[in-house]
């Protein structure tokens, strides 16, 4: 099994240039010959097409290569691949925002130092306190899934038994519920 040779755009472009030169000369010769022939034919429906299939294909490929060459940057064989890459990289870098322009456009600010923070010494370990996070636990069970629903039910049954065992609830159930609801609201 033979390995197919890969062709690059450069190779295709070079081949099309040589083909276009040959096809241009062939087309000129055909035009000269056609000019000498008479246009009269007995049956015009039997008259053969003057443009062959190969010529149509060549014209189509030439038109495409011309459009392709005009749309791209200079991809002629005179420019190296590294130079093309460098030009593209520089064009991309020009589109990126520059930090100098950003710093010029930002308003200037003065450093405001809080007097209470300035009094705090960084080496003072005795005054540091544990700060409890206010973020809610992200590991709560999902009530829409079966396992999460089961976990919630076990937690609620434990809470229910704890509430029933609570002496405050036994003495006045409504005041205990009111306190529990207020406590839940504060926790949230």
Curated annotation (Swiss-Prot):
Residues 1-89 are annotated as: Disordered. One of its GO terms (biological process) is maturation of SSU-rRNA from tricistronic rRNA transcript (SSU-rRNA, 5.8S rRNA, LSU-rRNA). Residues 59-81 have a biased composition (Polar residues). It comes from Debaryomyces hansenii (strain ATCC 36239 / CBS 767 / BCRC 21394 / JCM 1990 / NBRC 0083 / IGC 2968) (Yeast). Involved in ribosome biogenesis. Required for normal pre-rRNA processing in internal transcribed spacer 1 (ITS1). May be involved in the movements of the replication forks. Belongs to the SLX9 family. Keywords: Nucleus, Ribosome biogenesis, rRNA processing. This is Ribosome biogenesis protein SLX9. Residues 1-16 have a biased composition (Basic residues). The gene is SLX9. It is found in: Nucleus, Nucleolus. Residues 27-44 have a biased composition (Basic and acidic residues). One of its GO terms (cellular component) is 90S preribosome.
């Amino acid at each position: 099994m033979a390995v197919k040779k890969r062709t690059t755009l450069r190779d295709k472009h070079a081949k099309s240039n040589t083909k276009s030169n040959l096809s241009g000369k062939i087309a000129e010769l055909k035009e000269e010959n056609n000019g000498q022939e008479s246009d009269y034919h007995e049956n015009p429906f039997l008259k053969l097409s003057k443009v062959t299939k190969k010529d149509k294909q060549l014209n189509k490929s030439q038109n495409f290569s011309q459009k392709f060459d005009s749309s791209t940057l200079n991809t002629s064989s005179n420019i190296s691949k590294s130079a093309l890459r460098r030009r593209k990289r520089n064009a991309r870098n020009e589109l990126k925002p520059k930090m100098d322009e950003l710093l010029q456009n930002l308003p200037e600010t003065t450093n405001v130092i809080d007097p209470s923070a300035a009094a705090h010494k960084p080496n003072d370990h005795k005054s540091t306190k544990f700060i409890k996070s206010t973020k809610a636990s992200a590991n709560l069970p999902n009530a829409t899934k079966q396992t999460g629903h089961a976990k919630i039910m076990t937690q609620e049954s434990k809470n229910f038994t704890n509430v029933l065992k609570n002496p405050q609830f036994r003495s006045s159930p409504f005041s205990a519920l009111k306190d529990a609801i207020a406590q839940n609201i504060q926790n949230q």
